[in-house]
Amino acid sequence: MLGTSLSPHHENFWAVIKSYYQLTKPRIIPLLLITTAASMWIASHGHIDPVKLLITLLGGTLAAASAQTLNCIYDQDIDFSMQRTRKRPIPSGRVQPRHALIFALILGSLSFSLLMVFVNLLSACLALSGIVFYMLVYTHWLKRHHVQNIVIGGAAGSIPPLVGWAAVTGQLDWSAWILFALIFLWTPPHFWALALMIKEDYAEVEVPMLPVVKGEKITVDQIWIYTLIVVPFSLLLVFPFQASGLFYAIAALVLGAIFIQKAWELKQNPFDQSLAKSMFKYSILYMMLLCTAMVVDSLPAVHDVTALVTTTLASLT
């Protein structure tokens, strides 16, 4: 079905594969998987089942790929209108929408089946809910109609840690929801920094992103506020929930201080594209390193070292 006859724009079978791969927006997926993995490590207290980890990450990859493909189908008119996205598979004519829809449904079905059979039903349902929420709530309802689109729609990108936690424990407790909320609060400063960089593109296709509707100054003020909330919120995993320990706390404080500095610099210069780009790139690095710190902190050896340091310091006071 996915042969070279699908489109005259494809020179060979590998070009077809490349087009379908591009439909999934693969650069977005790794960050979603990192949050899933971090959640699983915390939930398992560092004793992760490698097979379950790989299956869960594969299921998450398929779910995210399905959601992104559906997004490409729905937003094909916007993509065609913007110079930056005009060469994507659907607006360029390399993939037909009906074929992309079949591809997305196959990916979503594989994700749900894989998680349900080899992990558990809760993780499968959560992954499916992420696809549905991303398409119906964010892409269809919010993105083109509401200035707070990315705030509410950010819930879709916050579901992966719930999937990871459910995969390990079969349930969702407060620590899982803290991880969900952490990513939910991180999403606006991350995405609004990007929106500042491509404001004109969004304005051209009448997508009401915050910089388009309210301007740069209000946008950077909102970025500043959310950043100030995210950093202390990240420490809730340490106290009072005690899901993470000293190593994570130190990492969260250091990474958070840099995040706040980036937001402050942008607040002082709201029209500086280089600062918006720096903020956007660092927001990705921040979340990646924060999740890495969660994983390292959960390792038994790190717990032993932390306990030794704590005991030593206590004996000196």
Curated annotation (Swiss-Prot):
The keyword Transferase applies. The keyword Ribonucleoprotein does not apply. Keywords: Cell inner membrane, Cell membrane, Heme biosynthesis, Membrane, Transferase, Transmembrane, Transmembrane helix. Pathway: Porphyrin-containing compound metabolism; heme O biosynthesis; heme O from protoheme: step 1/1. Its EC number is 2.5.1.141. The chain crosses the membrane at residues 28-48, 53-73, 101-121, 122-142, 150-170, 178-198, 223-243, 246-266, 282-302. It catalyses: heme b + (2E,6E)-farnesyl diphosphate + H2O = Fe(II)-heme o + diphosphate. CDD domains: PT_UbiA_Cox10. Its main location: membrane. It is a multi-pass membrane protein. One of its GO terms (cellular component) is plasma membrane. Coiled coil: none annotated. Pfam families: UbiA. GO terms for molecular function: protoheme IX farnesyltransferase activity. GO terms for biological process: heme O biosynthetic process. It is found in: Cell inner membrane. NCBIfam families: cyoE_ctaB, PRK04375.1-2. Carbon 2 of the heme B porphyrin ring is defined according to the Fischer nomenclature. Converts heme B (protoheme IX) to heme O by substitution of the vinyl group on carbon 2 of heme B porphyrin ring with a hydroxyethyl farnesyl side group. Belongs to the UbiA prenyltransferase family. Protoheme IX farnesyltransferase subfamily. HAMAP family: CyoE_CtaB. This is Protoheme IX farnesyltransferase. It comes from Picosynechococcus sp. (strain ATCC 27264 / PCC 7002 / PR-6). The gene is ctaB.
